[in-house]
């Protein structure tokens, strides 16, 4: 019966192949909240090593994209970035082949916080999206905070659930099929990214997805904290708080008649600044 339920998860929830990307770029994935200056300075320095070092900001996730973009431009310039541009695009603009030229000379791209679905409504499957993937393959640094962290993975948490809870009672159960996902940018295909993780108590939704997609790691990044994913598929934790990793690869998963998820044997890691993790072996690096 347990094997039948495992097959059910694969068929019903579209398990994604965890093939390694082989990209030469870096991911700088921030869990939201305040951004420590030393952490962000590292992003600026990394972006300066590729192309002509220009940083492109895409703030379309924000409800106030112009103001958000201007703020990020000022932040990066204050940290030493020489060339920073913010572009607020519509879906129509992103569908234009000319949109990809906005990324000429880019060494780093930064995706703002806000609503990740709003960002993806503009970018998904456009010439600009394809160019972003090409640049990542070539060595560019892709960074984002909060919603901009969520868009990094191929399977993206939207922040919604299928049941209709009362306000203040969101994500209170581990229930099969409850967590809504959609397609992200796909820079990382071996894990699902969640953000504001410990601060906003988001364990329930990520554990649910790990149960449903057991070949994908669940990586929950807290505020003021980031992971830097290198081309060798390892990541380092930087910042002031924690990163939680759930590994359900060898877990025993089942679902009750009332659709509650049971997950036995899941591995959990709680990582802090300086810790490193191998996405291939699913183990910490000592």
PLM segments and residue spans:
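Positively charged n-region of N-terminal signal peptides that target proteins for export
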Residues: 1-4
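Catalytic-core regions built around general acid/base machinery
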Residues: 102-105, 125-139
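Glycine/threonine-rich flexible loop motifs
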Residues: 116-126
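ATP/NTP phosphate-donor binding region
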Residues: 44, 53-102
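Catalytic nucleophile loop
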Residues: 112-113, 136-156
């Amino acid at each position: 019966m347990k094997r039948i339920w495992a097959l059910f998860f694969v068929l019903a929830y579209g398990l994604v192949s965890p093939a390694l990307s082989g990209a030469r770029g870096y991911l700088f994935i921030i869990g939201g909240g305040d951004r420590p200056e030393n952490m962000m300075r590292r992003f600026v320095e990394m972006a300066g090593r590729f192309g002509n070092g220009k940083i492109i900001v895409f703030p379309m996730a924000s409800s106030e994209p112009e103001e958000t973009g201007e703020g990020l431009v000022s932040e990066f310039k204050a940290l030493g970035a020489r060339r920073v541009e913010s572009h607020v695009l519509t879906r129509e603009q992103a569908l234009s082949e000319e949109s990809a030229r906005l990324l000429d000379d880019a060494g780093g791209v930064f995706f703002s916080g806000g609503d990740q679905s709003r960002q993806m409504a503009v970018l998904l499957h456009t010439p600009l999206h394809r160019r972003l993937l090409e640049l990542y393959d070539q060595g560019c640094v892709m960074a984002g905070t909060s919603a901009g962290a969520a868009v990094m993975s191929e399977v993206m948490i939207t922040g919604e659930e299928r049941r209709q809870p009362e306000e203040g009672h969101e994500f209170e159960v581990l229930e099969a099929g409850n967590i809504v996902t959609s397609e992200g940018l796909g820079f990382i295909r071996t894990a699902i990214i969640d953000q504001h993780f410990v601060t906003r108590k988001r364990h329930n939704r990520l554990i649910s997805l790990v149960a449903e997609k057991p070949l994908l790691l669940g990586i929950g990044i807290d505020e003021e904290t980031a992971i830097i994913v290198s081309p060798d598929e390892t990541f380092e934790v930087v910042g002031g708080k924690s990163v939680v990793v759930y590994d359900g690869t060898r877990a025993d998963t089942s679902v009750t008649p009332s659709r509650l998820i049971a997950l036995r044997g899941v591995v959990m890691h709680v990582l802090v600044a300086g810790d490193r993790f191998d996405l291939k072996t699913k183990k910490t690096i000592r």
